[in-house]
A protein has these predicted regions:
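Non-heme di-metal
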Residues: 1-110
Length: 110
């Protein structure tokens, strides 16, 4: 499992560094986030959180027993993440976005 984790860190290091040095992230950390930007972030986050469990379940169901530790890791995180989309919906409602509008919002494609 450790070798898998080490490989994962190595393969994603460049993207992690790009994320950590992105001007939008640096600005948000340094100056905070206005409501408009927070709302936009939450609208995108909703789709990530909402799709996490189905995607993880699909991945876990296709893994051979050789990948059982990863399968169990996914199952644990699916359990931990269950219901988090409700938190995002609640935060969006607090900044003036109705749940129906959130569900109708198409995520950005990058």
């Amino acid at each position: 499992m450790l070798s898998y984790f080490a490989e994962l860190v190595t393969r994603t290091d460049e993207d992690r560094r790009a994320f950590e040095t992105h001007p939008v992230l640096i600005d948000a950390v340094a100056h905070g986030m206005n409501v408009q930007r927070y709302r936009a972030l939450l609208l995108e986050l909703y789709h990530v959180v909402w799709h996490f469990n189905p995607v993880s379940a699909a991945a876990a169901s296709r893994m051979s027993d050789a990948w059982m530790p990863i399968r169990h890791f996914l199952y644990e995180h699916m359990h931990e993440e269950s219901g988090h989309e409700v938190w995002v919906l609640n935060d969006l409602e607090a900044v003036g976005v109705a749940p129906e509008a959130v569900r109708a919002h198409a995520p950005a494609v990058h």
